């Protein structure tokens, strides 16, 4: 097995032959001998976080204090009916949280959604529907085939950079210019 990739970015290369993952950045939430799981962080859906919370019938959802234009992301092709929330550490504990790094958690329980826009909410968060998973050794094989580049993750790219700029920014962190990153196969 490669180094543990938990808490790092996977950046799709032009070698990947899968339209779903073309030009994606994936935040790896878990990586061990059982495989890997991550979330695509640069593919917005047409559903805003506000619309999602309103549909889930949380009280006073439209009066909460968060970015009203923040979109729900398509986290991957697996379990697309399930929510995955990457967020910064908070004082509040949530029902189903998993520590990815010292400051980043992955939560799959609805209580984190109910907290959004309230004082106890995580300062920064991403809401995804679906995830990406790999069987044991599958991700390592894809990396060996040059489908993915590996980069250190950072809060700016994860939470602040515009969704569609995240792939170029992640490449630039590796010294690959935007023009080279966009080059495809002939």
UniProtKB/Swiss-Prot annotation:
GO cellular component, one term: cytosol
Superkingdom of origin: Bacteria
InterPro entries noted in UniProt: AlgH-like
SUPFAM superfamilies attached to this UniProt entry: VC0467-like
Pfam name, any one: DUF179
Family as reported in the entry's similarity comment: Belongs to the UPF0301 (AlgH) family.
HAMAP family linked: UPF0301
Protein name: UPF0301 protein APL_0232
